[in-house]
Protein backbone atom coordinates (compact mmCIF):
# COMPACT_ATOMS: atom_id res chain seq x y z
CA UNK A 1 0.00 0.00 0.00
CA UNK A 2 1.37 3.41 -0.93
CA UNK A 3 1.70 6.42 1.30
CA UNK A 4 -1.26 8.79 1.64
CA UNK A 5 -1.22 11.85 -0.61
CA UNK A 6 -2.06 14.07 2.37
CA UNK A 7 1.21 13.23 4.11
CA UNK A 8 4.55 14.81 3.18
CA UNK A 9 7.54 12.58 2.32
CA UNK A 10 9.33 11.20 5.38
CA UNK A 11 12.83 12.39 6.11
CA UNK A 12 14.41 11.98 9.53
CA UNK A 13 14.93 15.32 11.32
CA UNK A 14 18.59 14.61 12.08
CA UNK A 15 19.28 14.07 8.36
CA UNK A 16 17.79 17.49 7.58
CA UNK A 17 19.91 19.04 10.35
CA UNK A 18 23.10 17.47 8.95
CA UNK A 19 22.27 18.69 5.43
CA UNK A 20 21.50 22.24 6.60
CA UNK A 21 24.73 22.29 8.62
CA UNK A 22 26.80 21.09 5.63
CA UNK A 23 25.22 23.68 3.32
CA UNK A 24 25.74 26.48 5.86
CA UNK A 25 29.43 25.57 6.29
CA UNK A 26 29.81 25.17 2.50
CA UNK A 27 31.01 21.55 2.86
CA UNK A 28 29.22 20.28 -0.24
CA UNK A 29 31.99 17.84 -1.20
CA UNK A 30 32.19 16.10 2.18
CA UNK A 31 30.35 12.84 2.89
CA UNK A 32 27.38 13.06 5.26
CA UNK A 33 27.13 9.74 7.14
CA UNK A 34 23.58 8.63 7.95
CA UNK A 35 21.90 5.52 9.36
CA UNK A 36 18.39 6.44 8.23
CA UNK A 37 17.83 4.19 5.22
CA UNK A 38 14.08 4.87 5.30
CA UNK A 39 14.41 8.61 4.65
CA UNK A 40 13.20 9.87 1.28
CA UNK A 41 15.64 11.77 -0.93
CA UNK A 42 14.47 15.38 -1.32
CA UNK A 43 15.22 18.04 -3.94
CA UNK A 44 17.58 19.89 -1.61
CA UNK A 45 19.87 16.83 -1.45
CA UNK A 46 20.83 16.97 -5.16
CA UNK A 47 24.60 17.20 -5.59
CA UNK A 48 25.43 16.05 -2.04
CA UNK A 49 27.18 12.80 -1.15
CA UNK A 50 25.79 10.64 1.65
CA UNK A 51 27.37 7.68 3.38
CA UNK A 52 24.46 5.27 3.88
CA UNK A 53 25.08 2.62 6.54
CA UNK A 54 24.41 -0.95 5.41
CA UNK A 55 25.10 -2.64 8.75
CA UNK A 56 28.85 -2.90 8.25
CA UNK A 57 30.19 0.09 6.32
CA UNK A 58 29.05 3.42 4.92
CA UNK A 59 28.30 3.13 1.20
CA UNK A 60 28.86 6.46 -0.62
CA UNK A 61 25.78 7.63 -2.53
CA UNK A 62 26.03 10.72 -4.76
CA UNK A 63 22.51 12.10 -5.18
CA UNK A 64 21.34 13.17 -8.64
CA UNK A 65 17.95 14.31 -9.91
CA UNK A 66 16.82 10.78 -10.87
CA UNK A 67 16.99 9.68 -7.22
CA UNK A 68 14.50 12.23 -5.85
CA UNK A 69 11.50 10.54 -4.24
CA UNK A 70 13.28 7.26 -3.60
CA UNK A 71 14.75 6.05 -0.30
CA UNK A 72 18.41 5.99 0.71
CA UNK A 73 18.25 2.27 1.48
CA UNK A 74 17.63 1.44 -2.18
CA UNK A 75 21.19 2.49 -3.05
CA UNK A 76 22.99 0.68 -0.23
CA UNK A 77 22.64 -3.12 -0.51
CA UNK A 78 22.76 -5.03 2.77
CA UNK A 79 23.10 -8.57 1.46
CA UNK A 80 25.97 -10.04 -0.52
CA UNK A 81 25.11 -12.45 -3.32
CA UNK A 82 27.73 -15.19 -3.43
CA UNK A 83 26.32 -16.96 -6.47
CA UNK A 84 25.36 -20.56 -6.97
CA UNK A 85 28.03 -23.15 -6.41
CA UNK A 86 28.99 -25.07 -9.54
CA UNK A 87 28.73 -28.83 -9.94
CA UNK A 88 31.45 -30.55 -7.90
CA UNK A 89 31.31 -33.81 -9.87
CA UNK A 90 34.56 -34.73 -11.56
CA UNK A 91 34.14 -35.20 -15.28
CA UNK A 92 35.91 -38.18 -16.86
CA UNK A 93 37.52 -38.03 -20.26
From Swiss-Prot:
GO cellular component, one term: cytoplasm
Secretion signal, residue range per the UniProt entry: none
Keywords (A to Z) from UniProt: Ribonucleoprotein, Ribosomal protein, RNA-binding, rRNA-binding
InterPro entries named in the record: Ribosomal_uS19 (IPR002222), Ribosomal_uS19_bac-type (IPR005732), Ribosomal_uS19_CS (IPR020934), Ribosomal_uS19_SF (IPR023575)
Keyword Hydrolase: no
One Gene Ontology term of the molecular function aspect: rRNA binding
Record's function text: Protein S19 forms a complex with S13 that binds strongly to the 16S ribosomal RNA.
NCBIfam families assigned to the protein according to its UniProt record, in alphabetical order: rpsS_bact
Family affiliation: Belongs to the universal ribosomal protein uS19 family.
Protein name stated in the entry: Small ribosomal subunit protein uS19
Species in which this protein is naturally found: Ehrlichia canis (strain Jake)
Amino acid sequence: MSRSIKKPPFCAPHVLRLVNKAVAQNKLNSIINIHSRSSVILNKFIGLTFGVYNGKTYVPVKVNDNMVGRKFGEFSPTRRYTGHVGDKKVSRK
